[in-house]
Amino acid sequence: MSSTIFYRFKSQRNTSRILFDGTGLTVFDLKREIIQENKLGDGTDFQLKIYNPDTEEEYDDDAFVIPRSTSVIVKRSPAIKSFSVHSRLKGNVGAAALGNATRYVTGRPRVLQKRQHTATTTANVSGTTEEERIASMFATQENQWEQTQEEMSAATPVFFKSQTNKNSAQENEGPPPPGYMCYRCGGRDHWIKNCPTNSDPNFEGKRIRRTTGIPKKFLKSIEIDPETMTPEEMAQRKIMITDEGKFVVQVEDKQSWEDYQRKRENRQIDGDETIWRKGHFKDLPDDLKCPLTGGLLRQPVKTSKCCNIDFSKEALENALVESDFVCPNCETRDILLDSLVPDQDKEKEVETFLKKQEELHGSSKDGNQPETKKMKLMDPTGTAGLNNNTSLPTSVNNGGTPVPPVPLPFGIPPFPMFPMPFMPPTATITNPHQADASPKK
């Protein structure tokens, strides 16, 4: 029948056990079994300690035998490393390590040496007072410190130079590699730490800019001679340098600018949202009025589960979301967005109403005149017909009242095929009837 030793990590609540044959297990074997069972690694970065749960005494002797059916507490702490001068000179930094659990994985138990007592041992304190014992303790410490000073005075000092500083210093010695440039003066024959302008207090030259953070698609390569161009001239021409040592200039984002111009033109053509606002139409019927916005119904929808009243789609959806899906008219709960039904008949009535308003007032759905919208589509810049002496459909007659546009005969284009001849300002005829009324010679 196998024996058992119960163990528990100090940071855990559950208890585990180690099975073995015999009446007891040494501390060394117990630590090795715990490391292997919990897969703690090779033991180079931690140290493992075992304590008695009752007295909290550490089992520091690897040869001590722990009897079976014993409960212990296991604690894992960081390893304590100590480096010697010889290990540093040999380049093996991790050779000397003190207080780790490597020996439990490799199977090499620790050999404890008996401490050698110095000659300055404490005398028999029996029959002495407390003041005498304190004085004896200070005297012993003073003797030990004097002995340590004598040993240190006879020791030979060994100076160690860091290898990392030596390697970093050797990297920046010699000529720079191809493509390297000093960002301070623009030279290619020296490192920036050896720049001649470092010791010049009057140097105010501008550094050459780098392309950090700029996408490559916005950079254009150029060919220049850096020997004949100063950093001030490069900064004036906005020339930058890449990590490969190539000279580039930044270009504009044409695609984004074209998209912005296209959206701006579409907004000008499509007009604004004023026709859906409250008070835009004075003769708006009540059946085409949105109960939420007070304006014309836009994409009318119905609440099929409650009052069955038409609302504007966007306004009703926002109202339902803000009120936790409560109908704004009859206050019925659980009116989800999926229950909204588009009202096709009401949408046709809205379109018919807009057509009537366009015929009555001569304005289209977007609030612009039909001919004006057609001119915007033909010329988005809005400059057509302003520089030429062409009569617009809304020209005025002698009385100053607008003249309705006269349809052109079939076959004649609505715009002149050839440019109009230049007419000086003094000879401009403002009223075409004056030419007929002038006396003929």
Curated annotation (Swiss-Prot):
GO terms for biological process: mRNA processing; protein polyubiquitination; protein ubiquitination; termination of RNA polymerase II transcription; termination of RNA polymerase II transcription, poly(A)-coupled; ubiquitin-dependent protein catabolic process. Residues 355-400 are annotated as: Disordered. The modification Phosphoserine is found at S221. A zinc finger (CCHC-type) spans 180-197. Residues 5-78 form the DWNN domain. InterPro entries: DWNN_domain (IPR014891), RBBP6 (IPR033489), Znf_CCHC (IPR001878), Znf_CCHC_sf (IPR036875), Znf_RING/FYVE/PHD (IPR013083). Residues 384-400 have a biased composition (Polar residues). Keywords: Metal-binding, mRNA processing, Nucleus, Phosphoprotein, Zinc, Zinc-finger. Transmembrane segments: none annotated. Gene3D superfamilies: Phosphatidylinositol 3-kinase Catalytic Subunit, Chain A, domain 1, Zinc finger, CCHC-type, Zinc/RING finger domain, C3HC4 (zinc finger). CDD domains: vRING-HC-C4C4_RBBP6 (cd16620). PROSITE patterns: DWNN (PS51282), ZF_CCHC (PS50158). The keyword DNA damage does not apply. The keyword Nucleus applies. Residues 355-364 have a biased composition (Basic and acidic residues). Pfam families: DWNN. Present with 1130 molecules/cell in log phase SD medium. Component of the cleavage and polyadenylation factor (CPF) complex, which plays a key role in polyadenylation-dependent pre-mRNA 3'-end formation and cooperates with cleavage factors including the CFIA complex and NAB4/CFIB. Component of the cleavage and polyadenylation factor (CPF) complex, which is composed of PTI1, SYC1, SSU72, GLC7, MPE1, REF2, PFS2, PTA1, YSH1/BRR5, SWD2, CFT2/YDH1, YTH1, CFT1/YHH1, FIP1 and PAP1. This is Protein MPE1. It comes from Saccharomyces cerevisiae (strain ATCC 204508 / S288c) (Baker's yeast).
